[in-house]
Each structure stands twice: as structure tokens, then as C-alpha cells.
Amino acid sequence: MDAFFAAVEQRDNPELRGKPIAVGNEGHRGVVSTASYEARRYGVHSAMSSVVALRRCPQLIFTPVRMSVYKEISEHIHSIFHDYTDVIEPLSIDEAFLDVTENKQDIELAVDIAKDIKRRIREELNLTASAGVSYNKFLAKIASDYRKPDGLCVIHPSQALDFIARLPVEAFWGVGAVTAKKMHSMGIYNGAVLRSYSKGGLISAFGKMGAVYYDFARGIDDRPVVVDRERKSVGCERTLEEDLTRRSLLSVHLYQLVLELVERLRRGKFEGNVLTLKVKFSDFSQITRSRTVAQPLTSKTRILPVAKSLLADIDVEHMAVRLLGLSVSKSAAGFHRPVAVQLELDF
């Protein structure tokens, strides 16, 4: 979807159409969740501090997040997808991979399915969507972002290598700011230069992701579309009302986060044995600390001591804390579940 949350707000509030808006909290502690395309022209983007966003775009209009509305629309969109295929891998509330090699409508060309889905979303929901069509997930994702908003891009196998050659490395999946900077230091600015490196050379520079970059530069991505992907983690976070350095106050917020996390775990019927603490500082730098335990983390009594221990290992006195986050995930080795044993009683 195109600037999904912001597009919904502009659809439902005609006075906001054509204006720069941000979905999120306008307060000095606020963060932009989604920015409209009008706002993006000023350099406003998601995860940006509201203060910085307003500095870049003084006329920016903030609207509150209405997650229940967005989820309902997302469900409608997925119902449209299911009219064509059940091989669907959701990536987020507004994005998914579809494998339409075999489809319910017996439509021969994938591009025609993409056109039909875009048409139905426009007619049924009055929203625009962008679609990418190609022979693997890497290229389909690149294509979907290529002509936003309301775009449709097809990358045919015969065109793939030329397309990738011109692609800046920042557009490659798995290449963030740090990796891009390292690639630039090696003289790698696009797919053509990336392709000139050996697999061994890329692995030496980037670890196991080097092999992935090697394949991507050659248009290779063998990942299948995974239906009903198992949820890997459950978490929650909160931006504090003011930056804090006092551990006693941070402990209060940590306790409240633990209670919220326990409730989310209960609702999601999720069990895991790895607890991760995320701390974002006032300069927007962040660190994470994780701990693996033997038994599932499902209750306050199990999670709170681990959370406190993780926080104790982080220096918060020299840099004020802006945000705390907690999440539970599953370790690769799994966890031990105590076995109930019936005791024998002598009478």
C-alpha cells in the first residue's frame, strides 16, 4: 500500500487531502508512524521525531493512529488477495508476497492479476496500491517500490541483470545504512560493481549476508512464498514522557512494560525463552541486550527478574533514555517444558 496509514486518514478526512500529514503523536516525545507523500517531499519519514518533522515541515498536520481501522482495511485487502491465490506471505499490515503461478481465476499473466487487484482496491476501498511483478521475492519487492505511488513495475527475467546493475546498493534487501557505508568504502555503489566481487570476498566482508548479496546481484533468490509464517516474537515498547537517567524511574517503566508484554503473550498464545531489552537514548542511538532461559517466559514472575538484570547491564547514567522496549522470542534450541508428574500418596 502507498503511505497506508496516511492515505486512510486523507481518504476519511477530505480536508487533509493534498496536504502534508503525519500519523503519530505531535508532542515533543512523539514519533512519526507514517508520512503522506506531500510530507515526504520535505524529508519527513516514518520513525522520525515529531520535533524534527515539524522543523522540516512547519505546516505538517498530525493525526492520531487508528490501528483498528487500518487492521480492518488490511483484512479487506487480504480477502481480495484470496480471490486469486491462497499462497500469501504477509510482510506487514500493508504488504505481502503472492505466488500466482497457479491462481483461482486462471489468469495467464501475473501482471494482469496485479492490475486487477489494484483496480479492486481502488474501487472497493478508495485507496491506491503499488505492485511489483517478477520471478522471485527479491525482485518483486524492488519492483513494488520502484514506481510508488500507485505504481506497477514488471521485471522480466530477460531484463533482470540490467535492472540490477543500475540499482543502488541501498535498494538491496538487507543493506542498511551501516552496510551501505561499508560498501561505499569498498567502491560498491550499484549492482554492477557488487556483481564483480567474488562470493568469498563478499562473505569475508559481510559474513553470511555476503552470500545473499552475491546471489541478489545475479538475480537469484530461492526463498519460497511462505504461507502462515510462524510468529517469531511478541513485543512492546514505549517512548518516555521525558528522557530519564534515574534507574529507579526507569524500573517503574520497565515494570509496566513487563505487564503489557505478559498480556500480549497471553492474547497471542505465544511462548518463547529469549527476552530482549531495547534501549533508545536521547541522541536516537540504541542498543539491545538479550538473554536465553531454559523455560518459557510467560509470566511476570519469570520475565521481570530477567528484564531487571538486562537493564542493570546497561549504562543509563551517562546518556538519558528516550525509549524502552521488551520482546520475547524463541531460541533455535527451543526450551524445556516441565513435565507434570502424578505423585503416589501412601494411606
Residue ranges of predicted features:
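Gly/Gly-Pro- and Ser/Thr-rich, intrinsically disordered tail segments characteristic of DNA damage-repair
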Residues: 1-205, 210-211, 328, 332-336, ...
